Amino acid sequence: MSTRLPSIYQDFIHISRYARFNDDLGRRETWDETVDRYISYFKSKTDNNKKVPWDELRTAILNLEVMPSMRCLMTAGPALEKDQVAGYNCSYVAIDNVKAFDEIMYVLMCGTGVGFSVESKYTNKLPEVPEDLHESDTTVVVADSKIGWASSYREFISLLYSGKIAKWDVSKVRPSGERLKTFGGRASGPEPLVDLFKFTLNIFTKARGRKLSTLECHDIVCKIADIVVCGGVRRSALISLTDINDDQLRHAKSGDWWTHNGQRALANISAVY
C-alpha cells in the first residue's frame, strides 16, 4: 500500500521537485518509489558487510521522521552517478580566479546552491581586462551538456582576457522544451546561454583597461544563476559575501534596480566583518 504524504502541499512539492518520471509506467513516481530509488542507490554504494538498518531508514524517511539530502532524493540514480555534485545542498567559492565563473555555472546546473565571495581581497587577484578587445575568428562551440556549457563559458571568458571577442556556435544545444532524460525536466534551449555571452561581453567592454569591480563580478555570477534552469524546475540559489565597506554592493538593490539589473534578484547579499 502506497504511503501518502500528510498534505496536498507536500504532495505538490514532492511531485514537482523530487518525483522522477518513470518511462516504463508512463507517470511520475509515488512517494514510496522516490524513497525506494534513494535507498536502492545508496545501498548499491555500501559495503554489504556493514550492518545498515535499511528497512528502518526507509520507514523513517517514508514517515518523515528523518530526511536525507533533498538534492540526493531528487537525483539518486543515473543523474547522481553522472554528476555527483548534484548530491550536495550547498557549496562555496571565492571569486579569485577566472575559472570561478564557469565552476559556479556547473555547480548551479547540478542544482546545488552556491555561496560566493566578492570581497576585494579575492577579486583583486583577477587579471586586468585588456584595453583592446577585438573580434576574432575563433568560434566557441557549445556541447549539449552541463560540462559543455561550463567549458564553453570558460573558453569565452579566457578569450576575453586575451583580448579576443569570440563568436559562438550553439547549434548542438537541444531546443527548448526537449526532455532531459537523465537529469529530468525540460531543456531551456540555447537562448539563455547566448544571453549570458552577450551580458558578459558587455561587462568586459566597460571594464577595459582595469580589473572587474566587485559589483561586476557579483552581476556576472547573478546572470549565470539567472540563465541556469536545473531540471526545468529548480532555480538557482545564491548568497553573495561582500566587504562591509563595499558601497556598490550595499546599494546594489537600491532604487529601481530590477528595471536594468533584474539578475540581482538571484542572490542574497551579506557583508563579512
Kindly give the residue locations of the regions a language model identified:
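Extended catalytic cores of very large enzyme megasubunits
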Residues: 1-273
